[in-house]
Amino acid sequence: MAQSGGEARPGPKTAVQIRVAIQEAEDVDELEDEEEGAETRGAGDPARYLSPGWGSASEEEPSRGHSGTTASGGENEREDLEQEWKPPDEELIKKLVDQIEFYFSDENLEKDAFLLKHVRRNKLGYVSVKLLTSFKKVKHLTRDWRTTAHALKYSVVLELNEDHRKVRRTTPVPLFPNENLPSKMLLVYDLYLSPKLWALATPQKNGRVQEKVMEHLLKLFGTFGVISSVRILKPGRELPPDIRRISSRYSQVGTQECAIVEFEEVEAAIKAHEFMITESQGKENMKAVLIGMKPPKKKPAKDKNHDEEPTASIHLNKSLNKRVEELQYMGDESSANSSSDPESNPTSPMAGRRHAATNKLSPSGHQNLFLSPNASPCTSPWSSPLAQRKGVSRKSPLAEEGRLNCSTSPEIFRKCMDYSSDSSVTPSGSPWVRRRRQAEMGTQEKSPGTSPLLSRKMQTADGLPVGVLRLPRGPDNTRGFHGHERSRACV
């Protein structure tokens, strides 16, 4: 407020307060003027319906009409938008009308579940004009819903509501087959499963089968309501246009003889359908489907014996394969050299000779050694150069048992030591050694793990047999005793 005294000057804050008060008073006056102008508008004034205050050109861009400064208030913004909007030209009106009329056509509504949902949601069938403006093809023409509403005034097929914000068809929307809405028609199939009609399944000469079927259906369903028509559909015949649309939805139509019973009221059709469900439940009888509802799902009967046999065979094969893999894995694991075996020590000078001797411990090599003097140890499939190159010596189960028996039994350990000392001096091809080995094999036939041939495997980490401190040394500047036979594999 301004002060009356001359001494006190109005400060800047007081002046700002005065100006704000004046501005607020001006805004109030403008609001009152606009309200009076709105009351004086006639009923036919299009500005009454096409209020610019909505601002948004489409639902996807709600902030478009609210851009700009806010200091002057929403009233000035409405005035600017009212001045910006202009009625569309004739060409744009025609394009908008054609496009939206296509949206509401039967051809499009049958496929467009989204728009059909909005049509069914409103009891009067109205759809928002702003929603239609947000559609892709309409948005290419205009983004202002007021332009769309103005163009729809010129449509003959569509009509706007009182406030020009919603639109609907002038004709009612029919019931489409893809909708799960009950209709007045009842599809009856498996006719001749009825006890009163099964005798008519055989062709008769008088040709009155169809008439008797219709009489039975009229008598059966007439108790639920007034029947407008009964039609018999036979396979291979041309279907009526209204039934042709649902032929792809219901497999019974066109494939077997069935009947279409149409009632005058939807409630009567629903009652008849419920009655047929209770009658056909748990027994063979003719069945009925209410047109518009989901068709019954056919569940094929599964033969349990047929299904269980391949399943059991598959499980058996899997278990056998798994067992074979386990045995192979165990065999590979037992045949592979461990880090504690002397064969795995690459620094040992005796590794090559021991590896060659190990090849003779295989069953095939062992049999060839005694049965055929001229047999070569290379005939064994386990003594191939590839196996030697990989450093993997496949040992028979006798070898594994021999290792355990030699280490656990003192007597067997002594025998192993005797034969190891003999074989280190005597050539493996000596007849005396063969006879001695054959005698030992005969006496200990029941315990093959005590074979003297396996004693070479019982060695320490230095490459020496168990119980041997060092190998004998020969004279100086020589290769030791029996140097000419060192190149041969010792047993």
UniProtKB/Swiss-Prot annotation:
Q: What Pfam families does the entry give?
A: La, SUZ-C
Residues in domain SUZ-C? Answer: 427-485
Source superkingdom: Eukaryota
Q: Quote the CDD domains the UniProt record gives.
A: LARP_6 (cd08033), RRM_LARP6 (cd12289)
Q: Where is the composition biased (Acidic residues)?
A: 24-37
Describe tissue expression: Expressed in numerous tissues.
Residue positions of motif Nuclear export signal:
186-193
| Record localization | Cytoplasm; Nucleus
Q: Which GO terms describe its molecular function?
A: mRNA 5'-UTR binding; mRNA binding; myosin binding; RNA stem-loop binding; sequence-specific mRNA binding
Q: Where is the composition biased (Low complexity)?
A: 332-346
Which residues get modified to Phosphoserine?
Answer: 56, 58
A GO BP entry: regulation of translation
Chief location category: cytoplasm
For bias type Basic and acidic residues, the affected ranges are 482-491
Which SUPFAM superfamilies does the entry link to?
Answer: RNA-binding domain, RBD (SSF54928), Winged helix' DNA-binding domain (SSF46785)
Q: Report if keyword Cytoplasm is assigned.
A: yes
Question: What spans are recorded as compositionally biased (Polar residues)?
Answer: 359-386, 444-453
User: Taking every annotated instance into account, which residue ranges of this chain make up the domain HTH La-type RNA-binding?
Assistant: 86-177
Q: Where is this region: Disordered?
A: 1-87, 293-403, 423-491
Domain RRM, first and last residues per copy: 184-296
**Where in this protein would one find the motif Nuclear localization signal, according to its record?**
296-302
Its subunit composition reads: Interacts (via the HTH domain) with VIM/vimentin. Interacts (via C-terminus) with non-muscle myosin MYH10. Interacts (via C-terminus) with DHX9.
Q: This chain belongs to which protein, by name?
A: La-related protein 6
Encoding gene per record: LARP6
